[in-house]
C-alpha cells in the first residue's frame, strides 16, 4: 500500500532531486545502522516524505556527508541525518515488519516470513521508543485483516482504519502542531487506501482478492474514484497548508499535488493494459 507518496521526479529541480535523494539515503543509512541491512528492502520514499515534512516543520540541525555503499559503490551519494530521519527509519522498519508478518500469516509468503524474522529482534526496542505509533500500526494491520476477511463492502471503514495509522505516524510529538498533523495524516491515509483500491481494482478482480469496490459490487468507475481521491486530498491539503512550512516546501508540494497523481495514473494505466 506504500509507494504512492513520492515526487514527480521530472518536475523537480536539480537541487530538489539532490535534496530528495539525500533524505532517502539518510533514511537508508539509519536503517542499516539501527537494525539490519535486510531492513533496507522495505525502504520506501513515503517515509522520505514523512521526514521532509517533520524537518520542514521543526527545522532541526542536520548532519550531512557523502558516502558510497553496496548499492551505490561507484559514486558517493549525499546523505543527511537528524532526529526525524531516524524517526522515519524506525517507522520504515516497523511498517516493514508488520506488513511482512501479515503477508506471511494471510498469504503464506515465505520471503515475507524470512524478512519478518530478520526484523523481529528490533521490534521490542521500537515498541519501547515509540509505543503510540507501534500500537497504531498493530491496530491498523489487525483491523484491515479483519475487514478483508469479512469482505467489508464499505470503503470508508478500511480507509479510515489506514487513516488512523497515518495520523499517528505524522504526529511526532504532542504539541501545538499535533492536531493539524493528525488530521492531515488521517486524510492522507484515507487517500492512500482509496488510491490503492482503485489502482489494484483490475488485479484484485483477476486474482479474486479483497477490494472494497469489488465487495460493494461496483464496476470500474474512474471518474467516481477520482472524485473520492480529490475529496480526501483536499482535506489533507487543507491541514497541510496550515503548517508554517518554508524549508523544502516546493518539494513537499510536488509530492502532494503532483507526484501522488502521477503515480496513481501510471498504475491505473499499467493495470488497464494488463487487464486488456
Regions found by a protein language model. Give the residues of each.
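Acidic catalytic motifs of isoprenoid enzymes
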Residues: 1-183, 190, 194-230, 238-248, ...
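A glycine-rich phosphate-binding loop feature that marks nucleotide/adenosyl-phosphate handling sites
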Residues: 253-258
Amino acid at each position: 500500500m506504500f509507494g504512492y507518496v513520492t515526487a514527480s521526479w521530472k518536475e523537480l529541480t536539480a537541487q530538489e532531486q539532490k535534496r530528495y535523494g539525500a533524505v532517502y539515503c539518510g533514511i537508508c543509512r539509519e536503517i542499516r545502522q539501527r537494525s539490519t541491512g535486510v531492513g533496507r528492502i522495505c525502504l520506501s520514499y513515503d517515509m522520505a516524505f514523512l521526514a521532509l515534512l517533520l524537518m520542514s516543520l521543526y527545522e532541526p540541525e542536520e548532519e550531512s556527508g557523502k558516502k558510497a555503499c553496496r548499492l551505490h559503490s561507484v559514486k558517493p551519494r549525499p546523505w543527511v541525518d537528524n532526529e526525524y530521519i531516524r524517526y522515519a527509519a524506525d517507522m520504515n522498519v516497523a511498517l516493514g515488519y508488520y506488513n511482512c508478518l501479515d503477508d506471511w500469516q494471510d498469504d503464506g509468503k515465505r520471503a515475507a516470513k524470512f524478512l519478518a524474522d530478520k526484523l523481529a529482534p528490533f521490534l521490542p526496542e521500537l515498541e519501547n521508543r515509540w509505543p503510540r505509533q507501534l500500537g497504531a500500526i498493530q491496530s491498523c494491520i489487525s483491523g484491515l485483516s479483519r475487514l478483508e476477511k469479512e469482505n467489508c463492502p464499505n470503503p470508508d471503514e478500511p480507509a479510515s482504519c489506514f487513516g488512523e495509522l497515518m495520523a499517528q505516524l505524522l504526529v511526532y510529538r504532542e504539541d501545538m502542531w499535533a492536531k493539524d498533523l493528525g488530521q492531515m495524516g488521517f486524510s492522507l491515509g484515507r487517500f492512500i487506501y482509496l488510491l490503492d483500491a482503485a489502482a489494484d481494482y483490475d488485479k484484485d478482480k483477476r486474482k479474486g482478492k479483497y477490494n472494497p469496490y469489488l465487495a460493494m459490487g461496483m464496476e470500474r468507475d474512474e471518474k467516481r474514484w477520482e472524485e473520492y481521491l480529490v475529496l480526501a486530498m483536499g482535506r489533507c491539503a487543507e491541514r497541510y497548508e496550515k503548517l508554517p512550512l518554508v524549508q523544502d516546501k516546493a518539494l513537499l508540494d510536488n509530492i502532494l499535488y503532483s507526484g501522488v497523481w502521477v503515480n496513481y495514473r501510471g498504475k491505473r494505466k499499467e493495470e488497464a493494459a494488463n487487464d486488456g
